[in-house]
Design a protein with these regions (language model features):
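Short basic helix-loop element that most often maps to the first helix and adjoining turn
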Residues: 4-23
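Key DNA-contact positions within bacterial/archaeal DNA-binding proteins
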Residues: 18, 28-29, 57
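Recognition helix of helix-turn-helix/homeodomain-like DNA-binding domains
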Residues: 25-40
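DNA major-groove recognition helix of helix-turn-helix/homeodomain DNA-binding modules
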Residues: 42-60
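Short hydrophobic/aromatic patches at helix-to-coil boundaries
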Residues: 62-65
Length: 65
């Protein structure tokens, strides 16, 4: 399981898991799994990045892979 900076980034934006999930159109369970280091699809990463106000090219700021 790889680590990522999703939880740290989300919390710094004062955003709940539920709010991020709603904005990214994914389930809160998906957000939890990703924050715990589980892998996810590229499309899910894209949705999360956009919900955080980032561009797909900024994926290195959140995800290691």
């Amino acid at each position: 399981m790889g680590k990522n900076r999703l939880k740290e980034t989300r919390e710094s934006m004062l955003m709940s898991k539920t709010e991020l999930a709603r904005q990214a159109n994914v389930s809160p369970i998906t957000v939890s799994r990703i924050e715990n280091g589980m892998p996810c699809r590229m499309e899910t990463k894209r949705k999360i990045l956009l919900a955080l106000g980032l561009q797909p090219a900024d994926k290195h700021k959140i995800f290691k892979d």
